[in-house]
Amino acid sequence: MGEKDGLDQMGTADRIGALRLESGLSELELANELGLTVDGYCDLEQQDSELESVLSIAQALKLAQLLGTNLLGLLGEAEQPLKVPIARVRSALAAQLGSSAEAKEALEDEIDWDVGPFLEGSDQWTSVYTIEFIKKLAMAIEVDWQIVLAGVSNQDVPPVAGISE
């Protein structure tokens, strides 16, 4: 079994810790790059749910890049699914909802998120939403969340002042 195979068998927190050690970066360096406190970063290496529920998509993409992987790799998904560009998901969802405020409200109630910034295609949408949002949205529209997440790329993330590229 190769080293990468071992990473696939770990929980998310342990995988992040192992990738950090492999990268040679310190907890402080990663915390600074992500705009977190050291304690906030350490939570990522201790709690499996932190990556999905606390970091914005932009922060998660940055972490994956710094650790030499992609979002699905951070989550331990060995199989790389098809990618559906997030713009296509957005336009299909907008078409499905049409101009119905009721349909939009029903979706928001179902996933417990405001979809406004996502539907508007705001440059900042990846700073507003988490991976947990992508999972809930994908489930609601009956699409594999991995396909949706694979369609989110660093091109969707606006540059953040103070974070090195």
Predicted regions and their residues:
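Short, basic-rich loop-to-helix N-cap that marks the start of a DNA-contacting helix
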Residues: 48-65, 123-139
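Short C-terminal boundary/hinge segments that cap the last helix of small helical domains
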Residues: 65-82, 142-158
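A short, Lys/Arg-rich alpha-helix, primarily the initiator
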Residues: 1-22, 79-106, 146-150
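Residues that mark the N-terminal boundary/hinge immediately upstream of a DNA-recognition element
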Residues: 15, 26, 59, 70, ...
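Alpha-helical residues within the helix-turn-helix
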Residues: 21, 32, 65, 109, ...
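Short alpha-helical DNA-recognition segment
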Residues: 24-46, 98-122
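Mid-protein regulatory/catalytic core that forms ligand/cofactor-binding pockets
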Residues: 113-165
